[in-house]
Amino acid sequence: MKKIIPLLLISFLFFSCSDNGFNNNNPYIPNYSFSVTLNLSFASYSNLNFVSNAIYYAGPEVGPKGIYVFNTGSGYNAFDAACPNQALSSCSTLTLDGINVVCPCDDEEYSLFTGQGKLQYPLKQYRVEKNGNILRIYN
């Protein structure tokens, strides 16, 4: 009995660990390893200083379709700009529509607050860290 209790406690601790719900599995969007820094003091990124504003960033290091970065008011979200439920094609770059992005291939709308849409896959999300006026977006 004395050996069972520590074993149960260790098992409980092991199964209570989580990955913070960060799931980026998507068969349509390849995994790219990248790290980008954006200076919010620069005019091209200054919209991110205001709640519910987004910018599109299409540097070569972030993959074929770029990323959207969004100020939620309590932090920042970054999502791949490729339609999450379409194979990469000429119509699969999301377009900005207020606090949402829309896939031109199927007119599906996704929230920049949550990344959710109505189809199977949500937007592919990337990690964001803020240090002063610098945002680091990476995966």
Residue ranges and their predicted role:
Residues 1, 17-19:
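Short hydrophobic/aromatic-rich motifs at helix boundaries and adjacent loops
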Residues 2-7:
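Sec-dependent signal peptide recognition
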Residues 12-16:
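C-terminal motif of bacterial Sec signal peptides marking the signal peptidase cleavage site
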Residues 97-107, 117-128:
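Short cysteine/histidine-rich metal-coordination sites, predominantly Zn2+-binding motifs
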